[in-house]
Swiss-Prot record:
Function: Inhibits programmed -1 ribosomal frameshifting (-1PRF) of a variety of mRNAs from viruses and cellular genes. Interacts with the -1PRF signal of target mRNA and translating ribosomes and causes premature translation termination at the frameshifting site. May exhibit antiviral activity.
Region entry Interaction with PABPC1, spans: 102-150
Residues found modified as N-acetylserine: S2
Identification of the protein by name: Shiftless antiviral inhibitor of ribosomal frameshifting protein homolog
Acetylation as UniProt keyword: yes
Cellular compartments per GO CC: cytoplasm; cytosol; nucleoplasm; nucleus; P-body
Biased composition (Acidic residues): 272-290
Alphabetical GO biological process terms: defense response to virus; innate immune response; negative regulation of translational frameshifting; negative regulation of viral genome replication; regulation of translational termination; response to interferon-beta; response to type I interferon; response to type II interferon
Chain spans, region Disordered: 49-71, 269-290
Subunit details: Interacts with PABPC1. Found in a complex with PABPC1 and LARP1. Interacts with ELAV1, MOV10 and UPF1; the interactions increase in presence of RNA. Binds to ribosomes. Interacts with GSPT1.
Localisation per UniProt entry: Cytoplasm; Nucleus; Cytoplasm, P-body
A Pfam cross-reference name: UPF0515
Gene Ontology MF terms: ribosome binding; RNA binding; sequence-specific mRNA binding
Length: 290
């Protein structure tokens, strides 16, 4: 696929996500081709159309501006606006965010135990799901209290701030005073790419199997550091994601890597290839039906 095609696909996904998948992929593609992938302008024009058509008192809570004349008069935009009616208390926030060009998203960790594969994705808050690129199964994120990786610590005893490998809920000794500290959060991979931010301390924790164990250790605990996992012949996955149970929405959820380690263009190309393969499989299965 050409770079132009990739940019088009990104804009289609963003437009669809702004309206929670209620705009069809075909209609979104038509609008993005017509208006040069301007998902911001088209999104705001749809909100404007909803406000003009709705006429309820609730529409006063939508702060809109007159869109360009070509968008205001466009029949496809008008049709989409009509299909999204009526305006309700439940969907008002969706329209407000679309007007502000906001797509609330979070960085989440995913882990497939069968493939022993761990990855991070930036996903919409309303649908936190990602597909393992090895087995193609879709997963929910690793629970927040089970995440692992490079963690951020704040020692309550000496006020020292430090970072190191850990799993949420497992204590590590402070590099300043040795006091056992729980991690406050796990940092997405991009935060660890800056060499100036990396710790100069050798990893050490109180887990029983840590390659550089700190005493007294805690029996029955396992170290999250990759070196310990490899040395002990343990899988990379400390806590697996649950398989995602589909709600029926087909909107692709990879919006932006936001500086994470993988390239968004490659991810979209990969998604498109897999979607085409899935469609071919469905057609073949349908062709063999009685």
């Amino acid at each position: 696929m050409s770079q132009e095609g990739v940019e088009l696909e990104k804009s289609v996904r963003r437009l669809r996500e702004k309206f929670h998948g209620k705009v069809s992929s075909k209609k979104a593609g038509t609008l993005m081709r017509k208006f040069g992938s301007d998902h911001t302008g088209v999104g705001r024009s749809i909100v404007y159309g909803v406000k003009q058509k709705d006429g309820q008192e609730l529409s006063n809570d939508l702060d809109t501006q007159d869109p360009p004349e070509d968008m205001k008069q466009d029949r496809d935009i008008q049709a989409v606006a009509t299909s999204l009616l009526p305006l309700t208390e439940d969907n008002l926030r969706m329209f407000q965010r679309a007007q502000e060009d906001l797509i609330p998203a979070v960085d989440r960790q995913f882990a497939c135990s069968s493939c022993d594969h761990v990855w991070w994705r930036r996903v919409p808050q309303r649908k936190e799901v990602s597909r393992c690129r090895k087995c193609r199964k879709r997963y929910d994120p690793v629970p927040s209290d089970k995440m692992w990786g490079v963690a951020e610590f704040h020692c309550p005893k000496c006020r020292h701030n430090f970072r190191g490998w850990a799993q949420m809920g497992s204590r590590s000794p402070c590099y300043g005073c040795g006091f056992p500290v729980y991690p406050t959060r796990i940092l997405p991979p991009r935060w660890d790419r800056d060499p100036d931010r990396r710790s100069t301390h050798t990893h050490s924790c109180s887990a029983e199997d840590c390659y550089n164990r700190r005493e007294p250790h805690v029996p029955g605990t396992s170290c999250a550091h990759p070196k310990s996992r490899k040395q002990n012949h343990l899988p990379k996955v400390l806590h697996p994601s649950n398989l995602h149970i589909s709600s029926g929405s087909t909107v692709a959820t990879c919006l932006s890597q936001g500086g994470l380690l993988e390239d968004l263009d490659n991810l979209i190309l990969e998604d498109l290839k897999e979607e085409e393969e899935e469609e071919e499989e469905e057609e073949e299965e349908g062709g063999h039906g009685e």
